[in-house]
Amino acid sequence: MSEVFEIVKTGIDFFCNHLVFFNMLFAIVIVFFQRRDPKSVWAWLLLLYFIPVLGFVFYLLLGQDMHKRKMFRIKEVEDHISKDIRQQEYRLRSRDVQEMDDSIRGYEDLVMYNLEAGEAMLTKDNDVDIFIDGNEKFRALMEDLRNAEQFIHIQYYIIKNDVLFNQIKDILIEKAAQGVEVRVLFDAMGCRSVRHSYWKWLNEKGVQTAEFFPAILRRLQLRINYRNHRKIVVIDNKVAYVGGFNVGKEYIDLDEKFGHWRDTHLRICGSAVLGLQVRFILDWNYAAGENLFLRPELFRGIEAGTRDFCDMQIISSGPDKTTQQIHDNYLRLINKAQKSIYIQTPYFIPDEAILNALMIAVKSGIEVNIMIPCMPDHPFVYWATYSYIGDMVMAGANCYTYNNGFLHSKGMIVDGKVLCYGTANMDIRSFALNFEVNAVIYDEKRAQEMVDIFQKDLEVCRQITRDYYVARRLKIRIKEQICRLLSPLL
């Protein structure tokens, strides 16, 4: 026993004696071998220097970078999709696309970027319904689920085993018994409150489930910092949903802490459904270890919308990609704005590029409106958000807090012509660390509808004025600065 003790003691002594060496080694890894923002690099270096052991543990849990080649093997979906992309690129380069539709006039460069960076097809035959109330959204979703005939694909960051999912679960089990293929993809971190035995039970009932980034042990998650934040539903390739609502009772106003949950979700019919289907299947293949691309029938049955058509691209981003496509879309839209920018986000922690672009827009005479929640669901990001909002207030932007519950809506409208809504928050986590998906819609009617919704929300908002922000207490200022200082660690 004494020999074992001596071996352990020798190992501890060796580690402590070489702590500086290990710190230097990890510093080299962070600086030279990982693609990071310089602020993030310095934050991690300081943490490793001042808190060597705990800093190392935090780095293992939160700081590891991801590389596309290591984490995903993204395949071509079908030859004709690739062919269509090349044809669209040719038409954009030759400017023939201007013959197609006035709705993208002036945004050809953005359409081209989405094609090049993420193979996001521009589709033109889409219907869109906008939901801002959880009860209405889930009523429509459950009706569509009941009408499913071939397959149901569901992906949410958070699914809670409560009254809402109990209703959905009963429909899924019933449809599976009828021979409909049902797949549910969930994030390990977001669904950590649900026991694995519950998912196993659903599998036994015919509902296929898959966990994205499962923990090694129940409480040990080494990829905690990388979360699949996407919320996608695709049914028979006829209808799809994407937006901010997760699955839990708070999203249908049954949680006293938050009260009314204000979010935005899109119901889509048309060719854009295929973009969401491909996105779901890419994630499913990785999590479940399958290759659903060998099932060509899962990519058929796309039907055009039946009402007012709109142009749309489905874009996605994540730590597996070399470009931050959603971030770059927001940045390009801000820079192209000529009259107005409307932003709703629960978390406003932009990087320097987005922040500077918004400030330049304000100083150029463009009306910039930003709406955030009046209450926190995560205190850290809440106070960091207020710090960055303060910069925008002092620059002259119109900034508001939503006071009728919790604001979880995520998106931007520019010049009443283009809107970009989906799962991505206006923060560095969504841009660089989370797996996200948004819809870019080039349509004045839908854009104006979203502006009208924003204006309606202002009736229950409070404007953050310069006088109000300057007069905040010292305690609040300290909270803001500490949280802002730590935000690059994300």
Kindly give the residue locations of the regions a language model identified.
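Catalytic-core elements of nucleic-acid end-processing and repair enzymes
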Residues: 410
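Histidine/acidic-residue-rich catalytic or RNA/ligand-binding cores of hydrolases
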Residues: 353-355, 382-384, 414
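Cytochrome P450 I-helix active-site segment
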Residues: 205, 367, 371-378, 385-386, ...
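N-terminal localization/anchoring segments of enzymes in phospholipid and broader phosphate metabolism
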Residues: 1-328, 332, 336, 360, ...
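Helical hairpin unit composed of two closely spaced alpha helices linked by a short loop
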Residues: 337-339, 347-369, 373, 378
